[in-house]
């Protein structure tokens, strides 16, 4: 994907400079940026603590104070709760009034506990609709058809019986 973006940039020959990197190279980035575009932003949606990637992005944004565009085909792959760390680096994000994810979760997540061996752990996967409601003004959504995809996807669901032990872990 990087080489494709760079090839398009060369063809367009714009009067601005771009740097295209992957998330794994964030630590190498130097310079000042007016705009940062982050593709696959859902990859920063760790729970309940921010991922290393999200922390690096936050550091870059804090240093540069750029405009930020987050892109993702699947912004909430598991839960609306994942939105928090995707946007927490942006100073004007709709959740910036919360000190951290836990404060955010008290308002926007139905937190429940799950037994893990002899311990109970908090589970933050039941994000409320309020998260999407707060994010709506910042999001642009397209269907595959609106985005120009012509491929028809035919899905087939395969059901597989797991070992009883696996079901015990899940429950």
Can you describe what each PLM-predicted range is?
Residues 35, 53-146:
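Conserved P-loop NTPase motor "coupling/switch" region that bridges the ATPase
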Residues 1-9, 77-82:
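Conserved Walker A/P-loop ATP-binding site and its immediately adjacent core
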Residues 13, 29, 60-64:
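Conserved catalytic network of the ASCE P-loop NTPase/AAA+ motor domain
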Residues 26, 43-48, 77-78:
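Catalytic P-loop NTPase motifs of RecA-like helicase/translocase cores
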Residues 39-40:
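Walker B catalytic acidic pair
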């Amino acid at each position: 994907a990087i080489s494709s973006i760079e090839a398009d940039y060369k063809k367009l020959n714009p009067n601005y400079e771009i740097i295209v990197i992957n998330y794994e190279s964030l630590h190498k980035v130097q310079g000042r940026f007016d705009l940062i575009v982050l593709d696959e932003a859902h990859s920063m949606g760790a729970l309940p603590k921010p991922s290393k990637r999200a922390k690096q992005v936050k550091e870059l944004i804090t240093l540069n104070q750029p405009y930020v565009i987050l892109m993702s085909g699947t912004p909430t792959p598991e839960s609306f709760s994942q939105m928090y760390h995707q946007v927490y680096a942006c100073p004007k994000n709709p959740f910036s009034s919360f000190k951290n994810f836990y404060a955010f979760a008290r308002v926007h997540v139905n937190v429940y506990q799950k037994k893990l061996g002899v311990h109970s752990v908090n589970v933050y996967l039941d994000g409320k609709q309020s998260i999407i409601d707060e994010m709506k003004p910042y999001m642009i959504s397209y269907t595959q058809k609106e985005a120009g995809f012509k491929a028809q996807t035919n899905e087939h669901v395969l059901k597989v019986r797991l070992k009883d032990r696996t079901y015990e872990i899940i429950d």
